[in-house]
């Protein structure tokens, strides 16, 4: 009998407890989708049910058959070629008008046209969900516990608020970190934190700091003007809606939440209790940034092997390289080939729709990596300790290569002016100079030396939000302040008034005393 009980207990322990939840994914495109797809696969392994909203004109999302993965397809008034056109225009505009101190204004004007088209597509994607009452009713009945989105593709937050569920962001960057700074309330001191897309490092000269300061404020202005149209859309979508989202309040023995530097970790005893702490009065106008600021957790797709040290907030988690994995053995011959398998294909040859870059970088004979500077490719090179020759093209790629150059793991070649001699020289440099390989291996050791793997951290925080109905105890009070309170302008103004008043009174007293003593002196002389 005892043996049977022990055997039954062992079986129960092996089976484990199924705590599968329901996760909703807002649609996204390009590398944004590829990164979130990795997280989706891991959530499914942990027996969660995942539903992905898919516009009928989606370019990258391909529905597959999986009992734990549902693709909710809805109609939009455009096809795949529309999104493909927007992406193509974005790349070409950037290549033809790469921003520099002398071309930044023209770049802004040209990019504004592309972003306007992108916003039109995004609003049609939003309308396809928000104006589809049947779909919204179905989503409400599904009892989702969290929504995962990317702030580059708006409206996921609106859907989450309408469904009354918490939402999270997966984000690589925003230009000059404008979204993280103004919506997420992360401090970005321009004196030592380089603006994203500035191609600067944290070691800045006086001239660099001037350039960095201008870059921050210029890109803030661009964000304000290019994304302003979303404020009215958000107000209209959320207008008249009374929101009541479950949150958490926390009492910590170390006090209130505050920004931390990478070298600091918080250890604290928390006493948590559930509360209902957020209400949007009916009809009150809101903004895109205010709504984004309600995200429970921000999963930032970089890490300190890539980033320069800077302050961050407790609800920002760095998960760079979450897609990286050990290399698989490779065949003798790799062939990127689409179509019917050739009848004469040799046994030593394997066909691929897409060359397995990660496996190639992990091969022991790989000496260098020629890359355009995409974040995913750079992280695979870091993971396997491979030095790089960067040929950046657009978006964050020049900035990424600047980071790798500063860390001594890459050499850059200019796409517009390079020759075969330049490329060969760069390759010989990273292959023959030991410092590049040593620095690449140092970054690799840093990346691998983490207490929890990036993918596991990302999944943990999604499950954390599901378990606790949010993460309000990690939300800083900065979100509750007006802009002049946040910058302490009211306090500075009050102190200036006090100092000015004190100086005025002292001067008046001095003048009064001088006049008084002057009259007494004159009176004595007369006497």
Curated annotation (Swiss-Prot):
Keywords: Endoplasmic reticulum, Glycoprotein, Glycosyltransferase, Lipid metabolism, Membrane, Olfaction, Sensory transduction, Signal, Transferase, Transmembrane, Transmembrane helix. Glycans are attached at residues 49, 347. It is a single-pass type I membrane protein; Single-pass membrane protein. Residues 21-491 are lumenal. Its EC number is 2.4.1.17. The keyword Cell inner membrane does not apply. SUPFAM superfamilies: UDP-Glycosyltransferase/glycogen phosphorylase. The chain crosses the membrane at residues 492-512. It is an enzyme of class 2 (transferase). It is found in: Membrane; Endoplasmic reticulum membrane. GO terms for biological process: bile acid metabolic process; response to symbiont; sensory perception of chemical stimulus; sensory perception of smell; xenobiotic metabolic process. InterPro entries: UDP-glycosyltransferase (IPR050271), UDP_glucos_trans (IPR002213), UDP_glycos_trans_CS (IPR035595). One of its GO terms (molecular function) is glucuronosyltransferase activity. Belongs to the UDP-glycosyltransferase family. This is UDP-glucuronosyltransferase 2A1. It comes from Homo sapiens.
